[in-house]
Curated annotation (Swiss-Prot):
Protein encoded by which gene: BOL1
Record protein name field: BolA-like protein 1
Single GO biological process annotation from the record: protein maturation
UniProt record similarity statement: Belongs to the BolA/IbaG family.
One Pfam entry name: BolA
The keyword Mitochondrion is assigned to this record: yes
PANTHER family referenced in this protein's UniProt entry, alphabetically: BOLA-LIKE PROTEIN 1, PTHR46230
Miscellaneous section: Present with 238 molecules/cell in log phase SD medium.
GO CC, any one term: mitochondrial matrix
Gene deletion effect: No visible phenotype. Cells lacking BOL1 and BOL3 display defects in a subset of mitochondrial [4Fe-4S] enzymes.
Role noted for this protein: Acts as a mitochondrial iron-sulfur (Fe-S) cluster assembly factor that facilitates [4Fe-4S] cluster insertion into a subset of mitochondrial proteins such as lipoyl synthase (LS) and succinate dehydrogenase (SDH). Required during the last step of iron-sulfur protein assembly when the iron-sulfur cluster is inserted into the target protein. Probably acts together with the monothiol glutaredoxin GRX5, earlier than BOL3 and NFU1 in the [4Fe-4S] cluster insertion process. Not required for [2Fe-2S] cluster insertion into mitochondrial proteins.
Quaternary structure note: Interacts with GRX5.
Superkingdom of the organism of origin: Eukaryota
Length: 110
């Protein structure tokens, strides 16, 4: 159940990680992945002129804080933590989220 993955170490990724650590302190107890998928979107119309190499991220996270919440509510929790980075001109352009409870993660792993 303890899986950790990070495919980036840039300033935006470090900020994302810091904010998630504050908002979801239990994430370290479960599966977590932060991936910079920006390289897959070079030349994409939405990021033309953006000088940042960190625009598209994928977050896979398991937390007890998601228990009893529907998917949109879980997404809103993460969006609220990252709203400043998403509002910046050279900030996060796209965010793909996979947010599960420990029980959901365990049942999927079987």
């Amino acid at each position: 159940m303890f899986k950790r993955a990070m495919s980036t170490d840039g300033p935006v990724a470090r900020t994302i990680l810091k904010r998630l650590e504050c908002g979801f302190p239990d994430y370290k107890n479960f599966a977590f992945g932060l991936y910079n998928d920006s390289h897959k979107h070079k030349g994409h119309a939405g990021v033309q002129g953006n000088v940042s190499a960190e625009t598209h991220f994928r977050i896979e996270m398991v937390s007890k804080k998601f228990e009893g919440l529907k998917l949109p509510q879980r997404h809103r929790m993460v969006y609220s933590l990252l709203q400043d980075e998403m509002a910046q001109a050279n900030g996060i352009h796209a965010l793909q989220l996979s947010l599960k409870t420990p029980q959901e993660y365990e049942s999927k792993a079987k």
